[in-house]
Amino acid sequence: MTGPLVVTAPPAVDPSHDCVLCPRLSGHIAAWRTKEPDWHNGPVPTWLPPQGENAVRLLIVGLAPGARGANRTGRPFTGDASGEALFAGLDRHGLARGHRPGSAGEGVDLIGTAITNAVRCVPPENRPVAAEINACRAYLEPTLARFAKLQAVLTLGKIAHDACIRALGGRVSAHPFGHGAQTALNGLTIVSSYHCSRYNMNTGRLTEAMFDAVIADVAGMVQGR
């Protein structure tokens, strides 16, 4: 005699808007909801191209939403200085269209590319703690598995890089972060870059030429060049 059929729902790829998995982050968002009630003020979902997830060959993973960027707009990297650098590069190499200088991603459409963050909620002072990074892996893991045609992952910053390596079941020591470094894991090519934050760009840790070279490399991979 067989038991009842148990149907297990697939893991969620995006947290609910009222997620309270990380108390410090949910409290921080609650404060933003009071200050700016018309903003997104919640976990930021993965941004897909207009053609949907089956068109995605490249996934870009950043650190976390910016307070006045993605936390306001609800789309990763949109509305802040890091988005200005990212979308300019994606547009130059055929991975996005519609970028206008100074728009910080407003009005952009992605091409064959999805964008997400290792931590989905805006953290105080843009600094998530280890427990929050680990908790949000519950969404990063199914996001990495979501795209049937995914070929490459571009990680922006060491935290995003390490989170992706762990989410794919790898050891960080075997796949260390380095600007422009590439490593293979679970059938994917992981490409790393310093984060395109205003601080990194202003201090010269990351120049436009350095960032453009990495985007050109990953574009060549997913576009078959």
Please identify what each model-predicted range represents:
Residues 3-224:
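A polyanion-binding, active-site-adjacent surface
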